[in-house]
Amino acid sequence: FYVSLANPHRSREFARGMGIMTKTDKVDAYMLACYAFLKNPHRWEPPAPEIRYLGALLRRRDVLLGDALREENRLEKYLSTDTPADIISSCMHMAQLLRDEVSNIERQIKAHIKASPALRRDYTLLTSIKSVGPQLGMHMLVVLRSHDFSSAEQAAAFLGVVPIEKRSGTSVRSRPRMSKIGPPQLRAKLYMSALCGKIYNKRMRNIYDEMCLRGKPKMVAIGALMRKLVHWCYGVLKTGIVFNDEGLKQVLST
């Protein structure tokens, strides 16, 4: 036998589709057996150790950065109110400690990537795409090397940047919207990179302007740029070729 990691939301929706509302160990075992038989999910392979370690470092950095921002917001509030000096001093000390630890983790991340030829190569390929910066590049590296995506479309669907259409019948007819499943933190980084790309990346700017001229809402055009970034990231890792506007057309085109 082999192990497969099923999406818990999808497996639960599968159970509801079978008319199973009860949730016990015995019922779950039966439902998962039916799910595996009918869906034949992919075999799960653990990521390489260097990918797992990089992912752990990135998650730790994000947690520390969030804590540092919250502490700095508290400090701003304390400075604008009648707060005792000891409290302000404690808050300033804690904010500085958190910032120092963020810097320490970032140094570890850079050293880890530099020490691994495979990570260094993949990182160079990803950041060869204009508007893919260090943070997006490292996070996309972890996602794309942790999952065996068969296509760029599958990677985009995993990250929740594909449109969902509801046009069946009249009662459910609505505008297409982004699915927004998957990791929201990475989707936020894609959004910021898309905003940067529509200004500084000529190809992305042309895509954005063309969609706006066709009457598409601006947010729809931004979503298309986010999707395009995922396709390009998948393409450079799939081919092992540094990104350029002329090459890789068969893999990078959407």
Language model segments and positions:
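Short, solvent-exposed helix-loop connector elements
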Residues: 43-55, 79, 83, 174-177, ...
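Phosphate-backbone recognition surface of nucleic-acid-processing proteins
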Residues: 134, 139-214, 218, 253-254
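Short helix-capping/linker segments at secondary-structure and domain boundaries
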Residues: 39-44, 145-149, 196-203, 230-245
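Short, conserved catalytic/metal-binding motifs centered on acidic residues
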Residues: 7, 28, 32, 64, ...
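Long, charge-rich intrinsically disordered scaffolds of nucleic-acid metabolism proteins
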Residues: 1-125
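Basic, amphipathic alpha-helical segments enriched in Lys/Arg and hydrophobic/aromatic residues
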Residues: 213-254
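Short alpha-helical scaffolding segments that buttress acidic/His motifs in well-ordered protein cores
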Residues: 35, 140, 189-194, 225, ...
